[in-house]
Amino acid sequence: MAALKYAGLEDTDSEEELPPGWEERTTKDGWVYYANHLEEKTQWEHPKSGKRKRVAGGLPYGWEQETDENGQVYFVDHINKRTTYLDPRLAFTVEDNPAKPPTRQKYDGNSTAMEILQGRDLSGKVIIITGANSGIGFETAKSFALHGAYVILACRNMSRGNDAVQRILEEWHKAKVEAMTLDLASLRSVQNFAEAFKSKNMPLHILVCNAAIFGSSWCLTEDGLESTFQVNHLGHFYLVQLLEDILRRSSPARVVVVSSESHRFTEIKDSSGKLDFSLLSPSKKEYWAMLAYNRSKLCNILFSNELNRRLSPHGVTSNSVHPGNMIYSSIHRNWWVYTLLFTLARPFTKSMQQGAATTVYCATAAELEGLGGMYFNNCCRCLPSAEARNELTAVALWELSERLIREQLGRRSP
């Protein structure tokens, strides 16, 4: 089962496991009680811990609460066409303690994207995610789709994109999801994608700039720029520019830019303190894959912050995120050294679902409505590097990006 499986209800291990013969149930208004079938009695307190609990949040998308002829609450899963007396929210109970003031649900590095969206209905929301055919992008897209959103997977490889769509449809055949061609290494492809999306006459509520390359050998794109810089930054910059009018018409809208903690370990200015284009798009002789990636991730935060400063007055906010360290995904496929390193580190790192959590949080959290210009790690706001917070550098990068795009478009003109 789609949403329920990822909520963790298939895992029966618990610090408060019930004794034999006991069952956990919920009332109509969400209070948890315990049935002792051996003695045919019920009670509010957990038989071992003595705690009282209630369920947190609404039902998962596609679920409905009903009452049978005996007055007992049961739950209908309309997605998978089944009923159960087990409340799907029991994985998210909170202690009822009058001595403690109520606090909102807290998410951290162990949270999953499906947990973030527990009880949310995203019907009517249109979401674009770049690089969504695999890895964290795929988990992000799947999580949105399983909660009712219309999700567009913007992918360079349409065969893989369509495979990703089918994998989501296998989990829920009514998911609203499609793949569209987008190659961020080509400004022409970005333009074609934007035109194709505009022709659909759809709103755009959430744009997730997720796609990235890492560890690639030096090469120039068809636009004459170093590929890591163009794919990870400039292509996304151009995409947002082309879709800006739709985002503004769809407000409140959000942009989420996937960056990395590696942004802290680089510099993009020369000795005089000016933005250095030769560092952003280096020659083959000056190229090092790790530095190129780090610089592009610094660009991501600078871009997100400046985007928020420019568009937040129009109802469009932008935040940047770090998904997690050493997550095993396809991003490192171009460099065997990192493939080996990521493989060895895999048992100690986040899952893909956990890696998608911070993106999903920034895209949907009610408490972030109207708020932007921030950087998040493990679903919590944190301070990026001093350089990432430099407004003058952000403006310089914005102006450089606009100039590079104008130059490339000018070369195509007859």
UniProtKB/Swiss-Prot annotation:
Pfam families: adh_short, WW
Domain WW: 16-49, 57-90
Domain of life: Eukaryota
Gene Ontology cellular component annotations, sorted alphabetically: cytosol; Golgi apparatus; lysosome; microvillus; mitochondrion; plasma membrane; RNA polymerase II transcription regulator complex
UniProt: substrate binding residues: 260
Alphabetical UniProt keywords: Apoptosis, Cytoplasm, Golgi apparatus, Lysosome, Mitochondrion, NADP, Oxidoreductase, Phosphoprotein, Repeat, Wnt signaling pathway
Molecular functions per Gene Ontology: enzyme binding; oxidoreductase activity; transcription coactivator activity
EC number from the UniProt entry: 1.1.1.-
Residues the record marks as active site: 293 (proton acceptor)
Residues involved in NADP(+) binding: 131-137
UniProt name for this protein: WW domain-containing oxidoreductase
Origin species: Gallus gallus (Chicken)
UniProt lineage: Eukaryota, Metazoa, Chordata, Craniata, Vertebrata
